[in-house]
Amino acid sequence: MKEVLCANVTQHSGVEKDVFGRPGKRQVTVLSVQQWQAACQSINADLVWTIRRANLLVDGLSFSPADVGKQLRIGDLSLEITGETDPCSKMEMAHPGLELALTPDWRGGVTCRVLNDAMIHLGDPVTRD
């Protein structure tokens, strides 16, 4: 995973240059800083968020089942939250206990469908409605 300061996100391919990008309800994965930190604290580890392999990291929001169907706005980008990003065995390979630590309370993040094409930048405002 490579961190970038800006990214083009499209309805056709999700986050541009993502090799897994394609249309559908799991186009973009979004991770919450707060939920990532809670998972890391539960296993006494200080891990970089890119280990999670999520497309985007947002601060100030936590996700739950009540968010499915809501819109997440990042700058000019609108995403529809479609579900939970389930942690997989790759998380366990990245760090012992991480898969289990990401399991409760949607700590693994959410999947989203892209509703409009937009360029997003580090520091863009993030809201959910």
Regions found by a protein language model. Name each.
Residues 92-93, 124:
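Short, charged, solvent-exposed linker or helix-capping segments at domain edges/interfaces
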Residues 45-55, 94-108:
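Short, basic/aromatic beta-hairpin or loop at an interaction surface
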Residues 78-82, 101-115:
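Active-site scaffold segments
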Residues 110-129:
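Well-ordered alpha/beta subsegment
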